[in-house]
C-alpha cells in the first residue's frame, strides 16, 4: 500500500479504483487489482 499526500493521481491509475473513507482515513481500493491500494496521510 502506498501512502501519499494527495489521492488525485492514485484514483486515476486504474479504472476500478474507488475512494473510500474508513476510520477517518481516506483510502483508494481496487478489487480487481489490489496492488493499486493507497492511503492518504
Swiss-Prot record:
Keywords: Ribonucleoprotein, Ribosomal protein
GO CC terms in record: ribonucleoprotein complex; ribosome
Any single GO BP term: translation
Cystine bridges: none
Family named by the database record: Belongs to the bacterial ribosomal protein bL36 family.
NCBIfam families per the UniProt record, alphabetical: PRK00831.1 (NF002021), rpmJ_bact (TIGR01022)
Top-rank taxon: Bacteria
GO MF assignments: structural constituent of ribosome
One Pfam family named in its UniProt record: Ribosomal_L36
HAMAP family: Ribosomal_bL36
Protein name: Large ribosomal subunit protein bL36
Amino acid at each position: 500500500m502506498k501512502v501519499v499526500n494527495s489521492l488525485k493521481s492514485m484514483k486515476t491509475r486504474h479504472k476500478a479504483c474507488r475512494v473510500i473513507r474508513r476510520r477517518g482515513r481516506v483510502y483508494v481500493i481496487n478489487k480487481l487489482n489490489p496492488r493499486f491500494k493507497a492511503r492518504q496521510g
